[in-house]
Amino acid sequence: MITTRFAPSPTGFLHVGGVRTALFSWLYAKNNNGKFILRIEDTDLERSTQEAVDAILDGMSWLGLKNDGEIYYQTKRFDRYKEVIQELIADGKAYYCSCSKERLEELREYQQANNLKTGYDGKCRDANYVPQQGESYVVRFKNPQDGVVSWDDAVKGRISISNHELDDMIIQRADGSPTYNFCVVVDDIDMAITHIIRGDDHVNNTPKQINIYKALNANVPVFAHVPMILGPDGAKLSKRHGAVNVMQYREDGYLPQAILNYLVRLGWSHGDQEIFSIEEMIKAFNLEHINASPSRFDFEKLKWLNKHYIKESKFDDIQTEVEYHFAKTGLDISNGPDLKELVAVMAEKVDTLVELAEKSSYFYSDDISYDENAVKKHIKASTGEIFVKLLENFEALDAQQWQDPDVLHNIVSTTAEQCQVGMGKVGMPLRVAITGSGQSPDIGITLKLLGKNKVVARLTKALEELCK
């Protein structure tokens, strides 16, 4: 069975690069009716935090990238790692090393001063050293000293590294804890991982890991090293570009559908298709069409996709996110139009759900403030008479008539005729009075969504406060 994994380290938040790696791994598993494993690589005890673990799990849940089976934590598998280390020592494939930090530092300085390759010189490799109680030691892996490590990377093609370039890496630290490059191999073997899709910053780890696979007589999985994501300026993506906790994108009003759709196209293509549902992603995804070159993050493209999903999604598919953002504003959504109807009207005017909530606040809150520029531009000496006539005409409408935007639009038009002014001389002051600004959807739709009581109350208030 095809089995992939996403294995983040909880030393920081889940950012877009990690999300893309998780997405590619998840899609490949789903495309092949396989399994997708989530593993938290928390062996760095000093830097790993529960806050970061929670952020990773929250991000994966929000995006809908559900793992199969349990979530694995490396810190809960230390006994297993120590067991395998002892097997390697017993088989002569690993050894105890007593070299002090001072000796290793002197060795490094000597190598650098003489333009030699830096790395461990193998002093303890064949010394058959057995540590006595109280002695400090590490365990090193016996890397082959000749030959070449090669693999056919699913993204980068054939890669070969001479074993002469690799030293005997530490697989168990002096404090007894196992190291990253060793743990991941044991995990991937035990979890039957067949395909490892990860960032190309791991390419240099791969030959070391392949040698451990071979030492343990295990099958070497397929590796697919995905290029990094660059900022719009071509520099490495950083916080200033937006390499923030993926949950910040939620706070900024982006839909998970938009994030996933954007990231799947960031370094992977399927013809000219830009818009993908999750089902379409799963059906189309493969490793062959992952681009070997880095991609640049384009915020305008992400914003465009987000707008598309706000406009085109079934309301049921985005309702949770819409309600989340309205709740953040403190607006009482029971004091206004149905959110489904509101989104249909406002979607064309916003790029994010934050904008949606902000630009729609006047539908739900009676505490509106008037935009000074709009008041100055549209409220004139004659506006009071227009508001009086509008109130008279609106009061004459029954509940059924108020549900028809065309009827309401015609009332505004009729009022303009009665007052012998152009439509704009009525519509724009009316907008300011009922929304606080000169911008809103079509006036008939705006009146309908606000409802008769709100419109009459706000017109009355504007008549008193703006038309003195």
UniProtKB/Swiss-Prot annotation:
Keywords: Aminoacyl-tRNA synthetase, ATP-binding, Cytoplasm, Ligase, Metal-binding, Nucleotide-binding, Protein biosynthesis, Zinc. PROSITE patterns: AA_TRNA_LIGASE_I. The keyword Ligase applies. Monomer. It comes from Francisella tularensis subsp. novicida (strain U112). A motif ('HIGH' region) lies at residues 8-18. It is found in: Cytoplasm. Gene3D superfamilies: 1.10.10.350, HUPs. It holds the Pfam family Anticodon_2. GO terms for molecular function: ATP binding; glutamate-tRNA ligase activity; tRNA binding; zinc ion binding. Belongs to the class-I aminoacyl-tRNA synthetase family. Glutamate--tRNA ligase type 1 subfamily. This is Glutamate--tRNA ligase. Coiled coil: none annotated. A motif ('KMSKS' region) lies at residues 236-240. InterPro entries: aa-tRNA-synth_I_cd-bd, aa-tRNA-synth_I_codon-bd_sub2, aa-tRNA-synth_I_CS, aa_tRNA-synth_I_cd-bd_sf, Glu-tRNA-ligase_bac/mito, Glu/Gln-tRNA-synth, Glu/Gln-tRNA-synth_Ib_cat-dom, GluQ/Sye.
